[in-house]
Each structure stands twice: as structure tokens, then as C-alpha cells.
Amino acid sequence: MPSEHPFSDGISTPNPKETMNDTAQITASYGRRYIVRTPDGTTYEASTRKKRVDFACGDRVRISPVNAEQVVIEDFLPRQSLLYRQDAWKTKLIAANVTQLLIVTAAVPSPSVRLLQRALLAAEAAGIRAVIVLNKADLPETALWREKLKFYETLGYPVIETRALENAGSLRPALQGHSNILLGQSGMGKSTLTNALLGSQTARTGDISAALDSGKHTTTHARLYDLNGETQLIDSPGLQEFGLHHLQAADLPRYFPDFRHLVGQCRFHNCTHRAEPGCAFKAAAETRAASPERLAFLQGITDELPG
């Protein structure tokens, strides 16, 4: 009798060497351990060769069988996108092949403008559509934060209000047809939103959590879910910082919707947008055609980038 795979919902698993498709998608990542799913829906525990860690949740990969329950990831297939962060010491892959980043914020606990702005820059650099989710919108503390988010709407970033303890219905139309990732600080309600969106699928997360030695729904690693045949959702761990050392200083202005139209308009081609005469960026900030705070943010990010 074929052995029964613990993550296949009770469906028996035939001999993998006879039936396994050699491609799969990573649906959970935890260090160098992964869960992958083949096109026929079968899931396997997966490891990598030579301690490789350059794989991300959402990656489509080539695999080789080890036994009925385990495979080895050989390499990843070409990526549509890669969202990651990098500081002076290390690079952290967040997700691959996503088409939409949903930055989950809330007035409680205290939201980070710094994290929001950095995540938006990373999305712009990766060519990923960004949406801001104002969660816990029914809290009385929300009014001030809602007002601050109006600025980002003027830059072209949609702001969607949700109440995670309800059904997250306001979010569903925006997710449709995208490979989505929820990202934000700890405590903003990402996992609660995920539960609300998944409905009956939520119970399955316990098995994957057990396989990766984590709590039932404490998000310590990224996980991918299918909302329907056209829509995927990745829930990611909470974070407090978003390093941008992978960006090039010369490219930064193009990632600012409020400044990109000024690229090439300064008097000097190597303008640092600080003290040079004829700086279009400074002129825009001085006349309030652009935000002085945003120019200061651009200057600050430029200063911290290597080289």
C-alpha cells in the first residue's frame, strides 16, 4: 500500500519517482526547510542542496524526489518579481512572484511611518503594485492615522479599510487575480486578516505549522494560500525594520511617485538634491509642490546606502 502523506489531506501518495512532476511552488519557508506543492496539489517537505538559502515563499522551483514525503529543491525557475530587504549585514528574502504588496497598518499598536515608506520604496523597486490596508479601522484611535494616510493616496497608493474581526470583505475585490503578500509590523492583524480571508482553509495551517515546529498560527515564517484559482495570498512574519541596502542611490528618485517626474530637470546631472543651485527637487519642496518631509526622507535613504 502506498504511504499516506501528512500534508495531502489523506490522499495516498504514489511512488514519487514514477509520478512526481519535477516542478513545484514553495508554499512555506522556514530557514532552510520548506513545504512545496506540485501542480497536481501534492505537498512535500523540502530541503536544499549545499545549505542554499536563496529561495523564497512563492518561488517556482525544480525538485528531485528523496522519498514519498520529501524532495530536494534543485533550483528556482525565472522569477516574475522578488521582494526582499537588506541591511549592512544580511539579506532577507520575503516573497517571490508576487504582483501585489498589501502593507497592513493600524493605529494600535503605534504604526511606523518609517516602515511604511520603506516598504513602499521596496515595492516600487521590485515593480510590485502596493496597497495600504488600514486595519482595525473601527478603533477610536484610527482617526489621526487615517488622516496621515490620505497623503499616500495622493501618491497613487490605494488605502483600504478593514476590520479584521469581521469578514475582511472589503479587501477581497482588491486581491482578486493577484499573487498577494501581507506585510507589516507585528500586532497589526495580518494573521487575523488571513484567517478571515481563508475561512475553511484555516484549519489546514496547523499541519504545516507542526511540520515546521511553530505555533498553530503564530506567523514565524511565510506561508502561501490559494484563495481561488486566480488569487494567492502570502502571510509573512511581522517586522520592525526594512533595510534598503539593495537599492542604488542613483535610482531612488524614480521610486518616489512625487519626485520621479523631476528626474533629469536639475541643472547638474549628478545633483544630490541638497545645496546645488538649480535643483528641481529643492524648488518643488520650497514651493510645497512636493513635501519637504519626503525630500528629507529621500536624502536620508541616500545617505544610508553603501557607495
Swiss-Prot record:
Zn(2+) binds at residues 266, 271, 273, 279. One of its GO terms (biological process) is ribosomal small subunit biogenesis. Its cofactor is Zn(2+). The keyword Transport does not apply. One of its GO terms (molecular function) is metal ion binding. Residues 85-242 form the CP-type G domain. Residues 1-20 are annotated as: Disordered. It is an enzyme of class 3 (hydrolase). Monomer. Associates with 30S ribosomal subunit, binds 16S rRNA. One of several proteins that assist in the late maturation steps of the functional core of the 30S ribosomal subunit. Helps release RbfA from mature subunits. May play a role in the assembly of ribosomal proteins into the subunit. Circularly permuted GTPase that catalyzes slow GTP hydrolysis, GTPase activity is stimulated by the 30S ribosomal subunit. PANTHER family: SMALL RIBOSOMAL SUBUNIT BIOGENESIS GTPASE RSGA (PTHR32120), SMALL RIBOSOMAL SUBUNIT BIOGENESIS GTPASE RSGA 1, MITOCHONDRIAL-RELATED (PTHR32120:SF11). This is Small ribosomal subunit biogenesis GTPase RsgA. The lineage of its organism: Bacteria, Pseudomonadati, Pseudomonadota, Betaproteobacteria, Neisseriales.
